[in-house]
Amino acid sequence: MARFITGEDMTEIYAVGSSLVNPAIGAEGDVDTAAVLLKTARGVVVQISNSRRATYGYDQRIEVHGSLGMIRAGNQHESAVEFAGKQGFLTDPVQNFFLERYADAYRIEMEHFVTALQKGQLPSPSGHDGLMAQKLADAATRSAQTGQSVRL
């Protein structure tokens, strides 16, 4: 996602994580909370914050800050209804599972893939995009294990 949004490859990554919310995950060698910083050759900084525990639903948001402002995509709620009163704002809960939230996106992605193959075109994301995502994931793991940033 960072490569897609910035249009650039990452040149450095630093990752840190812990398993304080669910120690059983830590006992298996994994983390329940992680933070990742990435940097491009041009100096663009990408910050990622992950947690496996959001008691209020499937929380996934994105913000992109730039010289002209900021754009944000927030959580999808069970409905678009919002109530504002003396107590503040009330909304329906956020969708609780990624399959609910991304069902349409997965369907559209699959349709694109099939259409690209039928027309002899390259699908997007490409195999190269997948390879680069895997390299970033591997580098993030190395960084978290060593406590050092990893140059890419």
Language-model segments: what does each one mean?
Residues 68, 110, 134-137:
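Short amphipathic alpha-helical/adjacent loop interface patches that line ligand
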Residues 4-8, 67-71, 143:
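Phosphate/oxyanion-binding loops and surfaces in catalytic or ligand/nucleic-acid-binding neighborhoods
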Residues 32, 106-109, 126, 132:
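An acidic site on a long C-lobe helix of protein kinase domains
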Residues 41, 115-152:
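C-terminal helix-rich "cap/oligomerization" subdomain common to oxidoreductases
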